[in-house]
Amino acid sequence: MRCLPVFVILLLLIASAPGVDAQPKTKYDVPLASRHDFAKKTPKRLSKPRDCCLRHFLCCV
């Protein structure tokens, strides 16, 4: 019976600990950008020459 209060306290401490993301971030996780940021980046993207290939058609997007 002496272990029960210790167990309850430990359980409460574990429950109040900060959580960790279950899924690690990947290179495809990007923060949401505002419209202003998008407007500034679009001309830069359009002016860059791109090497598109048949295997990776998404590089042209």
Curated annotation (Swiss-Prot):
<keyword id="KW-0800">Toxin</keyword>
<feature type="propeptide">
    <location>
        <begin position="23"/>
        <end position="50"/>
    </location>
</feature>
<keyword id="KW-0732">Signal</keyword>
<keyword id="KW-0528">Neurotoxin</keyword>
<keyword id="KW-0964">Secreted</keyword>
<protein>
    <recommendedName>
        <fullName>Conotoxin VnMRCL-011</fullName>
    </recommendedName>
</protein>
<feature type="signal peptide">
    <location>
        <begin position="1"/>
        <end position="22"/>
    </location>
</feature>
<dbReference type="InterPro" id="IPR031565">
    <property type="entry name" value="T-conotoxin"/>
</dbReference>
<comment type="similarity">
    <text>Belongs to the conotoxin T superfamily.</text>
</comment>
<dbReference type="GO" id="GO:0005576">
    <property type="term" value="C:extracellular region"/>
</dbReference>
<dbReference type="GO" id="GO:0090729">
    <property type="term" value="F:toxin activity"/>
</dbReference>
<dbReference type="Pfam" id="PF16981">
    <property type="entry name" value="Chi-conotoxin"/>
</dbReference>
<keyword id="KW-1015">Disulfide bond</keyword>
